[in-house]
Amino acid sequence: LKVVIAHGGGYFPHYLGRMDRNHANRPDTVKNTGGRKPSEFLRAFHYDTCVYDPAVLSVLAERVGTDRLVMGSDYPVGEKDPVGWIQGLALPSSDVEKICGGNAARLLGLH
């Protein structure tokens, strides 16, 4: 199963400390994780880039890796130029290429 979470995963990537702490303190409340912490599941998903803040996207890229990010448009309310927004970030060109199409192509089995 391939899952892409909208809006950069929302609060999920930024809430990991709390989830891991609660998991450690109350393992009886978490079932079927195979002993894994919630943060260990983060890279199982893909995330779109509709976060509207370069600092937030930077944290997301650091936590999940740029290979898990796909460009999102958030149509009809999103960035007027979502590709240009990604290109304007302080990312290596190889990461920009992955985010702007390479990752989606891989995710969809197009190459």
Regions found by a protein language model. Name each.
Residues 46-47, 51-70, 76-111:
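Mid-to-C-terminal alpha-helical segments outside catalytic/metal-binding sites
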Residues 1-70:
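Catalytic pocket-lining loop regions of alpha/beta-barrel enzymes
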